[in-house]
Amino acid sequence: MSTIRVDVVSAEQSIFSGEAKFVALPGESGELGILRGHTPLITRIRPGSVRIEKADGDEEFVFVAGGYLEVQPDRVTVLADTAIRGHDLDEAKAIEAKKRAEEAMQNRGTDFDMALAQSEFAMAAAQLAAIARFRRKK
């Protein structure tokens, strides 16, 4: 099977750079699966898990907190707002963040920002889903 070049980068660092057989990630309108020869595409990505099936058959998981995806027939570039390797995700922090967001949505104060609380909740839920996926593949 032919491979495609994959680069996952955040503002802080390069998270993954290498050859892959397949890449799956959460696009703005749904889950995307990318193989070599894919039609060129630029789209926003939602918070969630990027699954990279590497050329050697191993899988790599990266959590992204949104960003942009560029696909060329021989290259995939993920420009993430924040990117964290699957094994570096902190479940306790994600659970606490989700709990804080839920409490904020229930206890609306005068300076309450519903959009911010919903965004934080979605981010924490996406991190927990990514952690669950990463654990299943171990």
UniProtKB/Swiss-Prot annotation:
InterPro entries the record matches: ATP_F1_dsu/esu_C_sf, ATP_synth_F1_dsu/esu, ATP_synth_F1_dsu/esu_N, ATP_synth_F1_esu_C, ATPsynth_dsu/esu_N
Localization per record: Cell membrane
One Pfam family, short name: ATP-synt_DE_N
Keyword Membrane on entry: yes
An example Gene Ontology molecular-function term: ATP binding
Gene3D superfamilies cross-referenced by the UniProt entry: ATP synthase delta/epsilon subunit, C-terminal domain (1.20.5.440), F0F1 ATP synthase delta/epsilon subunit, N-terminal (2.60.15.10)
Membrane topology type: Peripheral membrane protein
Predominant location: membrane
Family: Belongs to the ATPase epsilon chain family.
Subunit note: F-type ATPases have 2 components, CF(1) - the catalytic core - and CF(0) - the membrane proton channel. CF(1) has five subunits: alpha(3), beta(3), gamma(1), delta(1), epsilon(1). CF(0) has three main subunits: a, b and c.
Main function: Produces ATP from ADP in the presence of a proton gradient across the membrane.
Protein name in the entry: ATP synthase epsilon chain
Gene: atpC
